[in-house]
Amino acid sequence: MNGYIAAAIAVLIWASYPVATRAGVTGSFTPQELVTLRFGGGALLFLPYLLLQWRQVSRSAWLQGVPLTLFQGAGMGALVICGLQFAPAAHQAALGPGVSPAWVALLGFVIFARRPSTRAIVGATLCATGVLALASWSGMAHDARVLAGDAMFLAASVLGALYVLQL
């Protein structure tokens, strides 16, 4: 039962992020302010450690850590926040974490020659069908701004997939 409670809490956290961010972007915050709020606090907490220990961090740790930070950190966050200026939170929820497994399968094949399982191929095909349906709906509404936001969500999802593959 504890696993179900933990899963429910995780879903609530993931589901609240695009809604809260959309409210911030459409309210009084600029995307730059939201990115600063999201990552600035953690950066300030980490800064003293970094200043004291940066020479002890190996070159390989830097080469591995910096891309991870950009993939799952500021790069992905900035794309999501900027995309929420143009597209609804529901699109981010569908095109962000909803499409990430398809990107992991595709990029894993392209970059590492990992052949995806039949289930992964079926799942990626269903994800692509959903993306096309969402894009055609936005395109029929002749709303280029929504399509731009959707493209940012897909780019953020690619960064999330690269993060998973980097691990």
Where are these regions (language model features)?
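Glycine-/small-residue-enriched transmembrane alpha-helix faces in small-molecule transporters
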Residues: 1-37, 142-167
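Cytoplasmic-side transmembrane-helix entry/capping segments in multi-pass membrane proteins
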Residues: 4-8, 60-70, 116-128, 150
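Hydrophobic residues within membrane-embedded alpha-helical segments of Major Facilitator Superfamily
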Residues: 6-13, 18-20, 41, 71-75, ...
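Specific transmembrane alpha-helical segments of multi-pass solute transporters/efflux pumps
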Residues: 13-18, 26, 47-96, 105, ...
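Hydrophobic/aromatic residues within transmembrane alpha-helices
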Residues: 24, 34, 38, 83, ...
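Residues that define the loop-to-transmembrane-helix transition and helix capping
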Residues: 29-32, 90-91, 117
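Alpha-helical transmembrane segments of compact multi-pass small-molecule transporters, enriched
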Residues: 41-45, 95-110
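Hydrophobic transmembrane alpha-helices of multi-pass small-molecule transport proteins
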Residues: 46, 116-138, 157-160
